[in-house]
């Protein structure tokens, strides 16, 4: 069976790379994982992931998209498709491949032909009104993550407002509030992966 592809999108600095690092560390030994990172002109995210995550370097491929990072995950996915084929060739037993977008705006979405599921992550420092803007990335993602909740008191953000707005535009679709530096809220992300993505015996009772 082909690995499941999970896209991870969000603005620059929201915590996309850190989310992959935390997920792979938590699920290490439980499932087989790899990652593809997209950057406009560098391979910086791939280097950070190789340095900080439990993934071996040959399980990480960096893609230099050039221009608009949105194009590489939506209109022309050929570079990511090639990276996916290469990483599966290296590791045919993979369960999940994460595809991290380059930092993008609130309207960024993944092509359904590129990924099977998508996560969209923002951070509290961008302001409590961000969920209210209901960008396509936040609306269409399978899981919405509001990260860096610890910063709320310092930026004047009301987490209860962000939560209410998220419930309003997400409806029944899940969202999680996290502080990835301490792994607070990470259990919600892991539960979603086990139960909604893998739908296997890994599901927590």
UniProtKB/Swiss-Prot annotation:
Pfam families in alphabetical order: cobW
Domain of life: Bacteria
GO BP field: urea catabolic process
Keyword Electron transport found: no
Localization (cell): Cytoplasm
GO MF entry, a single one: nickel cation binding
Record family assignment: Belongs to the SIMIBI class G3E GTPase family. UreG subfamily.
Cited function: Facilitates the functional incorporation of the urease nickel metallocenter. This process requires GTP hydrolysis, probably effectuated by UreG.
Name of the featured protein: Urease accessory protein UreG
Taxonomic source organism: Corynebacterium urealyticum (strain ATCC 43042 / DSM 7109)
Gene assigned in the entry: ureG
């Amino acid at each position: 069976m082909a690995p499941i592809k999970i896209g991870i999108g969000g603005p620059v600095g929201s915590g996309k790379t850190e989310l992959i690092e935390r997920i792979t560390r938590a699920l290490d030994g439980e499932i087989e994982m790899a990652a593809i990172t997209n950057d406009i002109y560098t391979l910086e995210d791939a280097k950070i992931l190789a340095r900080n995550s439990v993934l071996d370097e040959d399980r990480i491929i960096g893609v230099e998209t050039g221009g608009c990072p949105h194009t590489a995950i939506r209109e022309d996915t050929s570079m990511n498709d090639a990276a996916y084929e290469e990483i599966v060739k290296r590791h045919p037993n993979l369960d999940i491949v994460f595809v991290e977008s380059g930092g993008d705006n609130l309207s960024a979405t993944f092509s359904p032909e590129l990924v099977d599921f998508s996560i969209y992550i923002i951070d509290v420092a961008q302001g409590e009104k961000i969920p209210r803007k209901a960008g396509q990335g936040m609306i269409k993602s399978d899981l919405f993550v509001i990260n860096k909740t610890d910063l709320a008191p310092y930026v004047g953000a009301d987490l209860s407002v962000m939560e209410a707005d998220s419930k309003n535009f997400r409806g029944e679709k899940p969202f999680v509030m996290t502080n990835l530096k301490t792994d607070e809220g990470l259990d919600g992300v892991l539960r979603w992966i086990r139960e909604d993505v893998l739908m296997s015996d890994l599901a927590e009772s």
